[in-house]
Each structure stands twice: as C-alpha cells, then as structure tokens.
Amino acid sequence: MLVIPPGLSEEEEALQKKFNKLKKKKKALLALKKQSSSSTASQGGVKRSLSEQPVVDTATATEQAKQLVKSGAISAIKAETKNSGFKRSRTLEGKLKDPEKGPVPTFQPFQRSVSADDDLQESSRRPQRKSLYESFVSSSDRLRELGPDGEEAEGPGAGDGPPRSFDWGYEERGGARSSASPPRSRSRDRSRERNRDRDRDRDRERDRERDRDRDRDRERDRDRDRDRDRDRERDREGPFRRSDSFPERRAPRKGNTLYVYGEDMTPTLLRGAFSPFGNIIDLSMDPPRNCAFVTYEKMESADQAVAELNGTQVESVQLKVSIARKQPMLDAATGKSVWGSLAVQNSPKGCHRDKRTQIVYSDDVYKENLVDGF
C-alpha cells in the first residue's frame, strides 16, 4: 500500500508557485492584445473617414478659400515684410535687439541643460591640462627666468612686449604668418637622448666584448680538455705508444738498448728470444712495470730485433719492442771506453747477478754426522 502524505512537498510547492506566475503573465498578455486591437481599430476608422472624403483639386480649393475670405468666415494670412539679404539666425537677431541681455535660452535637442553651478563643479573635477609653456619648460628653467622676488628677471627683451607664449601653429600678424621658434628645452632633451643612446651603444659594445672573451675562454678550455684526453689515451696504450708517438715529425731513434713490454716475462724467455740477433751485453728487468731493457753490442742487431720481434708472441707472451728513449752508455756498450763498460756492469740498471758461487751441501754429510753421534 502506498502512503501519500497529506501536505505538499517542497518541489510540488515550487511548481505550484511557478504555475500561478504563468497564469498571471498569460492574463496580462491577453489584456495587452485587447488594447492593441482596439487602438488599431480606432486608427482604421479615422483612416476610413479620411479616405471617404472626396478628393478636391487645388483650383477648386483656392476658389472655396477666396469665397470664405470674402464672407468673413476666414481671415486672410498677412505676408511678412522681409528685408532682402542673407538669412540670420534667430539667436543672432535677439543679440542684436538686446545686446545687454545674454543669449536667449533656446531648446537644443542634442545638448542637456546644465546650470552654472554644475559647470563649476565639472571644471573642478576635470584634470586641468598644462599649458604649452608648462609642458615644454621645466620648473628649473622657470625659476631661472624668475627673479629673486618671484618676478620675471629683467633681461634683453623683458617688458618690451607681451609675455612669451609658446603658441604652436601659425599666427596672423599684419597678414604674414610666423611660426613660434621651439624652446630651449627641446635642444636639451635632444642632447640628453643622444647621450643616452651613446651610453647604450657603449654598454652593448662592452657586453659583446665580454661574450667574445667568454667564447675564447671556452675554446681554450676545450683545447686543454682535448690535449688531456689525448695524453690519457697515450698513457693507457702504454709506454710503447708514448715512445713512438709522432713518428713523422721525429727522426727514427738510434741505439743499442731496447725497451721490451710484456706481462709475465722472465730472463730466460728474453735471452732465448733476443740472443739470435746479436751479443747481449746487459739485460735488466722491472717486474712491477712489466718491462725490461736489453742492450746489444751493435746497433744493427737492435734494429733487427725491433723489426722481427715487435708485436709478436713468444711463449704466450705478447711483446712490444722499441728503441729505448734513453741510451745511457752508448760508448760503453760499443766498447770504446774501459770505464764505461765497468760502469755499465755495476750500474743499478745493469747486471744484478751475484758472481759468488753457490755452495751446495749433500744430505749424506748430515746422515753421517747423525749416525756417528748416536
């Protein structure tokens, strides 16, 4: 079972109010329509009455008018006597008749009536415009022109005529047109603008120079970075690359000492690999750096060893062979100096082999002593 509430809900009440408003509006519209229809009907009746009258010609109308004038029913229209000449406005005629009186108040449709008090209020509200003299001449120039007592300083031309007024345009004096000369402040403003333009140009030039200097510094930094990267690459590739860098510019090295680079090298491996090319005077190794120095008796044998062994693999060891940058004792190696040969033999990079003979004890001696003791 549906339960219907006794009262109306809020929505129903709102709808009922709207319906009542619409009813009122409909009644008002019907009343307006009736009024408009009655007015149109009255206008139509007037038009019909006018149209029903017979059409009269101008000649018959004039004759009827003359008869009426003769009978005295209509008074004749008197023609005004007008002076021949140009037409004048009524306001001007009123001014000529009564010059003491002000202008005759006439109705002007496009101008609202304004009283004198309203004019004063509006003039006080409006921002007063500066005169041409005030707009072109600054306050400092005016103070210079005024004297110590606030009066105009007497100078050449002061008091000779009316005060100076900067009236732009053309003035008719004695039939000739003369334009007023521009004030001094214009020339000052122009000079100031020129100075400002010069300062701006100087600032722009300075900014351009700074930008150029920055670009140069950046180029230098880039060149330095490139050089550093090249040096790092050479260091990574090893001393062989560093020793043989720029082969076109430098003359080929000469010497009898070779620089050998390779991992896990041993003296026996080096002697076996380099002895077939000539007599080896000295062989020194630097295990932490994985390099060794081999000195031949002759330079020809060193050149032959570089040509044959550079980049080859001996007993699973990759060898890089080149002429050493430092050739410490060329004369000693070639045998021209006695003292040089001794220095090479006893140098820190020379031969480190111990010349003493190694004493080897057999196990039988210890066994015999043990047997005799017990």
From Swiss-Prot:
Gene3D superfamilies: 3.30.70.330. InterPro entries: NELFE, NELFE_RRM, Nucleotide-bd_a/b_plait_sf, RBD_domain_sf, RRM_dom. GO terms for biological process: negative regulation of transcription elongation by RNA polymerase II. The modification Phosphoserine is found at residues 51, 113, 115, 131, 139, 165, 179, 181, 185, 187, 191, 243, 245, 275, 347. There is a cross-link at K78, K82 (Glycyl lysine isopeptide (Lys-Gly) (interchain with G-Cter in SUMO2)). Residues 90-101, 186-250 have a biased composition (Basic and acidic residues). Sequence repeats lie at residues 184-185, 186-187, 188-189, 190-191, 192-193, 194-195, 196-197, 198-199, 200-201, 202-203, 204-205, 206-207, 208-209, 210-211, 212-213, 214-215, 216-217, 218-219, 220-221, 222-223, 224-225, 226-227, 228-229, 230-231, 232-233, 234-235, 236-237. Residues 256-326 form the RRM domain. Residues 184-237 are annotated as: 27 X 2 AA approximate tandem repeats of R-[DSNE]. The modification PolyADP-ribosyl glutamic acid is found at E122, E151, E172, E368. GO terms for cellular component: chromosome; NELF complex. Phosphorylated by the P-TEFb complex at sites next to its RNA recognition motif, promoting its release from chromatin. Sumoylated. There is a cross-link at K78 (Glycyl lysine isopeptide (Lys-Gly) (interchain with G-Cter in SUMO1)). The NELF complex is composed of NELFA, NELFB, NELFCD and NELFE. Interacts with NELFB. This is Negative elongation factor E. It comes from Bos taurus.
